[in-house]
Amino acid sequence: MIKIKFLKKNERIIYFEITGHANHGEYGEDIVCSAVSSVSQMTLNGLMETLKLDDKLQYKEKEGYIVCDLDKSNLTDDEIEKSQILILSMYSYLKAVEESYGKYVEIRVREV
């Protein structure tokens, strides 16, 4: 199962962590894992390349694991606001995946 955690502070998503594998299909053919991987990579790339936050962004990624902590990234209020567009888009997409494939994806949101 893929477990996704979002932390919110003052109505903003400041942290996300994605762990695990869906095991919905064979390696390389798992549409659930592919969907989650694609949208999370797109979001990280958007934060780093489109918003030019690559030098500030606190993140880590490896096989079956992505974490991004905006709260520890020393971003300006403007950078955090802009990042929310990408992160909220990812969140909406992942919620749709969870609705369709809830056996393989679990999302938790917590206010801090």
Regions found by a protein language model. Name each.
Residues V32-V36:
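Short, conserved glycine- and acidic-residue-centered signature motifs
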Residues M1-I31, Q41, N45-V112:
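N-terminal intrinsically disordered, cationic/polar leader segments
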